[in-house]
Regions:
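N-terminal secretory/targeting leader peptides
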Residues: 2-13, 17-26, 36-131, 144-344
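N-terminal signal peptide c-region/cleavage motif recognized by signal peptidases
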Residues: 32-34
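An acidic, glycine-rich surface segment that forms the CoA-thioester-binding/catalytic face
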Residues: 135
Length: 344
């Protein structure tokens, strides 16, 4: 056996991968074969609060993996950016220092650029269309997953609906003209800064862990996120207005280190796959069921909610965003956009 590898379920894996599975260096050096196969722990780091659906689904996934593996395979979850910020978490999965994380498609685009196209604003007809595109068995996702594995040693295991992203600010906004000169927080990836600039604002990249402070101190005047995030993080305490721009329909993409995946036994792979199918559906359903309720809750908590009925000019936002997307990404992602639109 290579002195820099161990055996997991009968398969050789690197010491780095063993550490990604949550084993200490001494344990990784001493254990091999059947003893490791009986008990494996994989680390899952993410940036969301445990109370949010995005955070809770990681815990649900851990529970489902334990259930389907008969307790032989454990997933240890580290929420709230304990193991790093968004970019750091993406890189940690690629390097193998953790086994799992979840991220936006735009964030995963930092590992394999074409992936970011999945987060293009105003791209999907509806939620059903989005979920068909990001199903791991769809032709689009299969193509992207193959590229991601080759480029970054990372594979997608599932993607759940994350919500429609909406704008918040401390003033009423009805059209792109109302955002001229306003500094709005953007997820620190190009497709997101483009979305915010397309809405009419000046995009300020800020990591999620720093957003509440940035809003409270005036570093940025607003931000954009699904309503479940706005509610769970209590952004209504520092933002007075919610604009239902719905400019992005997002999937949260759960990824796994490829070496860690290949190091699992067939039985453990099956447990992960079954858990992925179950939690994708559960998380998607939870977010869909809560969107209207969460919007009402934000209104009840004092936010002024502005939608088309209140004069929000969705067509103007769409036209402005589409123009900028075409300028920046039309040539790069045009063929992929056509494949996405062709899925029915």
């Amino acid at each position: 056996m290579n002195r820099n590898s161990i055996h997991l379920g009968g398969r050789p894996v690197s010491r780095r991968t063993a550490l990604a599975l949550g084993l200490g260096a001494s344990a990784a050096a001493m254990l091999s074969g059947p003893s490791l196969a009986q008990s494996v722990t994989l680390r899952y780091g993410h940036n969301n609060e445990p109370a949010s659906v995005a955070g809770a689904q990681a815990d649900w996934f851990a529970e489902a993996v334990a259930k389907y593996s008969g307790g032989d395979l454990a997933v240890e979850v580290f929420p709230s950016s304990q193991l790093g910020k968004l970019q750091e978490l993406a890189e940690a999965v690629s390097l193998g220092t953790i086994a799992f994380s979840h991220n936006t498609a735009g964030g995963i685009g930092s590992l394999y650029e074409p992936f970011a196209a999945l987060d293009t604003p105003y791209l999907y007809r509806d939620v059903d269309h989005l979920m068909k595109v990001v199903d791991v068995s769809s032709p689009v996702m299969q193509e992207l997953n193959e590229g991601l594995i080759k480029a970054a040693n990372v594979r997608v295991i599932y993607a759940h609906y994350f919500g429609r992203r909406n704008l918040t600010a401390n003033k009423a906004v009805y059209s792109p003209a109302d955002l001229a000169g306003e500094k709005i927080r953007a997820v620190p990836f190009p497709i997101y800064t483009t979305a915010v600039e397309g809405l009419g604002a000046a995009a300020v990249p800020v990591d999620w862990s720093e957003v509440p402070t940035a809003l409270a101190t005036g570093v940025v005047a607003g931000q954009e996120n699904p309503v479940n995030v706005i509610l769970n993080v209590k952004l209504y305490e520092v933002q007075s207005h919610l604009m239902l721009t719905g400019h992005m329909s997002n999937a949260e993409v759960v990824v796994m280190n490829e070496d860690a995946w290949q190091g699992l036994s067939d039985e453990h792979k099956e447990a992960v796959t079954k858990a992925a199918v179950e939690i994708r559906e559960r998380a998607t359903k939870a977010i869909q069921e809560n969107e209207e309720k969460d919007t009402r809750a934000l209104r009840d908590l004092g936010m002024t909610v502005i939608g088309p009925e209140e004069g929000l000019k969705i067509d103007a936002f769409r036209a402005s965003v589409d123009k900028l997307v075409q300028e920046r990404f039309g040539e790069k992602y045009g063929a992929l956009y056509e494949k996405i639109r062709a899925i029915s």
